[in-house]
Amino acid sequence: MPVLVSNLQGKVAVDEALTGLLTRAAQEVLKAEGYGEEAEVSLVFVDDAYIHGLNRQYRGVDAPTDVLSFAMQEGEPLAGGEEELILGDVVISLQAAERQAGEYGHSLQREAAYLAVHGVLHLLGYDHQGEEERKIMRRKEEEVLGRLNLTR
């Protein structure tokens, strides 16, 4: 289950422990949802200005956000080579993660892992527009975070 990590920002320190945790978080979601070793996602770390531009361009929202998911194809993953299943990209503003961690009283690691889990679930088609969808998605997020020992 390859998880490709790119750090396109320099405002929040990124070390191997953080990238390792977020890689495991993404892999835990994929395992929980029945994906095999061929499933691949990318995690891209950016700052608020970068994600603001993406949010404006792709969602028509002129404000920064914490996480955006870009599925390779809406509704279904894109098959890569014979042994690849490329699901898409999860773009995380580490500036937002750091700020929200302070607001919620937990670590950057916990907040960034939550955003990674949330983003990968979006890649897999989960949403939180309605109350029932929100409950399902929240339960799945908490299950994965619990397996990583990252509870509130």
Swiss-Prot record:
Cysteine pairs bridged by disulfides in the record: none
The Gene Ontology biological process terms listed for this entry are: rRNA processing
What Enzyme Commission number(s) apply to this enzyme? 3.1.-.-
Write down the superkingdom of origin.
Bacteria
Query: Which cofactors does it use?
Result: Zn(2+)
Q: Which GO terms describe its molecular function?
A: metalloendopeptidase activity; RNA endonuclease activity; zinc ion binding
Question: What is the main EC category here?
Answer: hydrolase
Q: Which UniProt keywords apply?
A: Cytoplasm, Endonuclease, Hydrolase, Metal-binding, Nuclease, Ribosome biogenesis, rRNA processing, Zinc
Task: Return the Pfam families for the record.
Answer: YbeY (PF02130)
> Is Acyltransferase tagged as a keyword?
no
| Positions annotated to bind Zn(2+) | 118, 122, 128
**Subcellular localization, per the record?**
Cytoplasm
- Tell me yes or no: is Transport among this UniProt entry's keywords: no
The entry's free-text remark on the cofactor is: Binds 1 zinc ion.
Q: What is its main location?
A: cytoplasm
Q: In the UniProt record, which is one GO cellular component term?
A: cytoplasm
Coiled-coil boundaries: none
Q: What does this protein do?
A: Single strand-specific metallo-endoribonuclease involved in late-stage 70S ribosome quality control and in maturation of the 3' terminus of the 16S rRNA.
In the record, the note on similarity to other proteins reads:
Belongs to the endoribonuclease YbeY family.
Protein's recorded name: Endoribonuclease YbeY
- State the organism named in the record: Pelotomaculum thermopropionicum (strain DSM 13744 / JCM 10971 / SI)
